[in-house]
Amino acid sequence: MKPLRLSLLAVAMAAVLVACGSTSGSTVDSADADATVTSVDMAFEAETITVAAGEAFTVALVNQDSMPHNIAIYADSSKSETLFEGEMVTDGTIVYDIEALDAGEYFFDCSLHPEMTGTLIVEG
């Protein structure tokens, strides 16, 4: 019975360590990003972000909610053409590397919460 008890204890401890150490995204410094979007109370604080055309760019998502969020970029609000979909982050910050886009106006949202929306303006 002792080996079984030790095995169960080891499994339980491993589960606790995994649960405590798990994150849905990298905790990073958003200061170096080209644009920053903060999610608070199920809304994006920056409803419009602007970047330069023809250059790859970075967007930091600072998630201050306890729910997972991400940023997905679409050609327009119909969401028929997805240009980028970032991984989810819960209660932390993640910086997305996004390929260059042509000058224009694009739509972004959180994939899980479509009411969280914004406009990406690419100038050039």
Predicted regions and their residues:
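C-terminal motif of bacterial Sec signal peptides marking the signal peptidase cleavage site
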Residues: 15-19
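Beta-strand cores of secreted/periplasmic/IMS beta-sandwich domains, seen most often
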Residues: 47-67, 94-109
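Histidine- and aromatic-enriched segments that form or immediately flank copper-ligand environments
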Residues: 66-89
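Bacterial N-terminal signal peptides that target proteins for export
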Residues: 1-8
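N-terminal edge beta-strand
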Residues: 29-55
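A mature extracytoplasmic/lumenal domain signature
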Residues: 41, 62-65, 73-77, 100-102, ...
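Bacterial lipoprotein signal-peptidase II cleavage site
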Residues: 5, 20-30
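Extracellular/periplasmic metallocenter environments
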Residues: 22, 89-124
